[in-house]
Amino acid sequence: MSNFDTSFFKDLLKEERRECLEGPGLDLGLHEAFVEACQASQYAKEAKDIAESEEEVEMAKASMEEALEKCVESAKPILDSIDLMESDLEMSLLRTAILVRGGSKGFAKFANQSDLHGQLVETLLNNKKIMKEFLLNGGPTGKKYGNAMKLYTQMMAGLEKDRFYKVNKKIAMAVALEFASPQTEFDTAVEIDAEKRFSHYEKAHRKGELDPAFTYFSTWEYRMAINSDASNEQLQWARNMQMVYAPHITTLYDERWRYNYQVSTDVGYRAPNWTASPRTYQQLLSGGGREGPRAWFGRFMCRAFGIPVWGFKQHPKNVGMSRWTPKGWEMNFQKPGSDFGTCHWDDRSGTHFMEEVNARAAVSESEFYEKVILLECLADACKEKMKKDEEFDFVDPERVWRSLALVQRKILADKVQTDSFQRTGPNVVISKIDKYIQNINEQAPPLPYDKLDNGTIKIPAASFTESNEKKHVRSHQSFDGGNQLHMVDGKGHVTYEIPEDISFQEGIDYMLSLIVATVHLTQQNLQLETNNATSAYEIEIPYTLGEWQETEPIEIEVGALSTMKFSRTKASDCFGLAIKEIILTPC
């Protein structure tokens, strides 16, 4: 097929269009009523756009809602009378839509690059299942249908037909569509390798590193989970870091903040401090930032754990994010009192996005495909053109089929229920997060101190006897077993009492060190006060990038030692400090 030119694809499109136009017609009276309702709706929108006072705006909004309801009512008898699956037009509708959206020039250019590319295009245009999946799941970025087919074929070629096959097939489709048009890593010109991105999420899922719901997302949802601009190495770091440094964030009952709550605790609201080029998400966590960087980090953390994310803007200086939760999509970092109706992302409004989210969640994929996607295909067949990068989000009397698809989507969206967003099913893999939650035992007693044969004493950091409020100091179980302590800010302090059965070797001083994890370049020293010393010791805390690391040992006096109190100095740059263990080693 590599010798086929633009004319071939134009002729093929004409032929497929002809087939489509032999399909269902519209009752003239119903058609006129719907067009009239669409026109009235447009007039109401235009009135709102030019309204000046708040009163005029509110009146125009009410008129728009009333007009839209009339559109819905006039569309219902038309929609009830149409079943595009019965008319034997499915193949022609799919081909037409793909040829229109991919463009004759685009297909010809790709197909003529090599014999393989020609074969890929031929396979795509003759494979109903793949065409359906492409269109059902939003089409490829940049309308690069040929490249999406190439990527999908390459990824599918290496798939094993094991218990992960169904999920991996969806991930492969999501990656192929999302990275059909090349994307680059954060603050670099390095192109993201689609196959490596697929491999990253496939392996992370297989190892149970992702959110428990990841197994059950749709391909359309996967696209918003795997499309991070972070490198695969940074995504892996994000999961490892949070599981070590702040494991409690992976189990928050308020799913809106699960994984991304670390923005509130650790991404300081301040001018960002980038310490190297290119910038990285590790630098962002350490150096802080305002609206933009904080939203970036929240999206990054959610996607690292496989959670679908949609970014948004409310005005040039306000950038936020929305994310999937089992109760529906929710917003983070938005302006107070605002909602999806006040935001947008690129050319898409939040209202438009949420309508599609709700419609897809309310019904099965097959119903959404048959009732919405095929209507959009018919609109392409009827030459109801879309402007470049246009998001068709309002009825248009001159684009009847596209308007019917929009109304149908609204009707489906209105059916959404609270439980429509639950993502559960038969276990393919037990996630580490599920295991962690199952093992949480808030009634478990503190772990005992341990004295080794060489005289070394190990004190579990969570086995303190006294601390101040939980908002400053908290303890929780670790992913790798045992417990850990988290000093949230510079106001926290903890005290340890040496049990009577723990004795020190007489006449010998000891070296004290701690196993800690930190995520900030600048650290406040840890202060140690003991009952047997007149002045406090200072322990330098390293920047560990979220990994467990031992501090440099300091020498302390242990004669008559019975209590140790650890604290830090309150400061604007004093953030979290995770402590796993305190070690006292004889010199």
Question: Positions of the model-derived regions?
Answer:
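Residue-level detection of beta-strand-connecting loop/turn positions
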Residues: M1, K327, T530-N532
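Short, solvent-exposed mixed-charge patches
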Residues: M1-S2, C587
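Intrinsically disordered, low-complexity N-terminal segments that are enriched in acidic
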Residues: S2-I192
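Long, compositionally biased intrinsically disordered regions
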Residues: F34, C38-S41, S349-H472, N483
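Short, solvent-exposed coil/turn linker segments
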Residues: D83, G103-G106, L120, I130, ...
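Secondary-structure boundary elements
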Residues: H117-L284
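Hydrophobic/aromatic-rich core segments of domains that either
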Residues: T275-Y281, G287, G292-C377
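Extracytoplasmic
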Residues: V429-C587
